Amino acid sequence: MEHIKTLIIGSGPAGYTAAIYAGRADLKPVLYAGLQPGGQLTTTTIVENFPGYPNGVDGNQMMMDMREQAERFGTEMRDGSITHIEFENRPYRVEDEDGKAFTTDTIIIATGATAKYLGLEDEEKYKGQGVSACATCDGFFYRKRTVAVVGGGDTACEEALYLASLAKKVYMIVRKPFLRAAEIMQQRVKEKENIEILFETNTKGLFGDNGVEGAHLVRHLGEPNEEAFDIAIDGFFLAIGHKPNTELFKGHIDLDEQGFIKVVPGTATTNLPGIFAAGDVADPIYRQGVVAAGSGAKAAIEADRYLQKL
């Protein structure tokens, strides 16, 4: 049976950076790219907040650059996903989706987190053309424009406040008749003059010839006073949470109440020896490419130190 020193599950900034560091440490890493090679950044039209690209860079191109750099240092790239891990014994026995089995001394988990969407057909149609799940990433493109934020929790309020500092007008589309955010966040939102909260409102669709130009909304859905109306917007931001891709690890690796992998603070170390986590899968707070890359570097360094003690 094949044996490898370091297995990296998932690509994106965390996985590829871990691969670069692991390759340079001669760990001969094998990286499984997963269902979306390159991760969420491959759907981002332009990335302007990652160091080293003064004029910005296409998200897909940046991931291709990282992949090429990882390959240069000896990373073996494999398509597909890991479907099974035997956590009870070491070295860990692993199987991929094609049934190929092998063992590994260390595992770096970089499977990411998936933004939750409403499930509208239009969301996919306009993704990267007005639809976003990251105000910090894309808010700059909507300076002096009108945007909408979907959600009523802390994340939605944070996104709305951030966008309000850039945009001319921010609508908050809230399904319930109240906000679920902390009281201080609610107060800040309500005090912001360019934020308008649309309570008891659902999004039915988006429209526009060249990207998002507006949203079809319904107030009091399913009630006698149901009312359909449209708003003109340039950007549509989802802020209804992220789902970490941790199904494979449940019951074995410690997760928090949201399903994110718990790591020892300041490290990439999980509760299992030789298993490390990097990127959004272990980050319920920041979810930024540059942060993910840094955590990927930490995971690879820790994997190297772990192997040196074997």
Where are each of the predicted segments found?
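Short beta-strand/turn micro-motifs composed of small residues
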Residues: 10, 33, 111, 151, ...
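FAD-site-proximal beta/loop scaffold in flavoenzymes
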Residues: 119, 125-141, 240-291, 295, ...
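Phosphate-coordination loops involved in phosphoryl transfer and adenosine-cofactor binding
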Residues: 3-5, 79-80, 143-145, 200, ...
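A Rossmann-like FAD-binding core segment of flavoenzymes
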Residues: 70-89, 93-96, 101-102, 165-265, ...
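Residue-level detector of alpha-helix initiation sites
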Residues: 12-13, 36, 113-115, 154-155, ...
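Glycine/small-residue-rich loop that forms an oxyanion/phosphate-binding "nest" at active or ligand-binding sites
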Residues: 77-140
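Beta1-alpha1 glycine-rich phosphate/pyrophosphate-binding loop at the start
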Residues: 2-73, 157-183, 256
